Amino acid sequence: MKKIGFIGAGNMATAIIKGLMAQNDGKADFINVFDVSEEKCAAMKNMGANVMTSADEIAKNSSIVVLAVKPQNYPEVLESLKNSITTAKTVVSIAAGISIAYVRKGLECDCPVVRVMPNTPLLLKKGATALCPSENISDEDKEIVYNMFAGSGVCEYIDESHMNEIIAVNGSSPAYIYLFAKAMADYAKNCGID
């Protein structure tokens, strides 16, 4: 099995990692993780993942590198990966608003990239994920990335030209629906309904 590296170990990365583990009999020995938070690293180590000390180390020791950081952190992360990402590696971006071209430009590399828009129901294994691969991804890596998300819901490959609409409909809307449902429940509780 190819090594899959995660830069960032927040809620979404953790959900993806748990989905991968569920597909692999609970094993996490093929998963490498780096996060700036020692607490998150400790949690990943307890799950059985290989915790590394830098983003660069993740890139050097992983065939597929998942960028699971907030969009505002991309410039710094991409800069730190410039010397370790090659065209032999596949980069997966799960940040809203970050295009394939942006990732390649930041890395100064024409590596395979998969732009992904998961949504929060992925945390409950009920996600709907849109994936957009670059033209130079191998069939093997395309299948691996698809399966990373298929274990936690449904997946669909789309053209990158539709990604902004997908972000609005699929990526952001579940949070608003949750907020609306919570407001309804709070209202009922305030009316004495328990």
Predicted regions and their residues:
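NAD(P)+-binding Rossmann beta1-loop-alpha1 motif at the extreme N-terminus of oxidoreductases
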Residues: 1-60, 126-127, 189-190
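Hydrophobic packing within well-folded, soluble alpha/beta domains
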Residues: 4-6, 31, 65, 92, ...
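Hydrophobic residues within alpha-helices
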Residues: 16-17, 81, 184
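Rossmann-like NAD(P)(H) cofactor-binding subdomain of soluble oxidoreductases
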Residues: 47, 55-60, 64-67, 71-131
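Internal alpha-helical scaffold of NAD(P)-dependent oxidoreductase catalytic cores
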Residues: 102-112, 128-166, 176-194
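Alpha-helical membrane segments and immediately flanking helix-loop junctions
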Residues: 169
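Aromatic-residue-lined binding/catalytic grooves and analogous aromatic/hydrophobic interfacial grooves
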Residues: 173
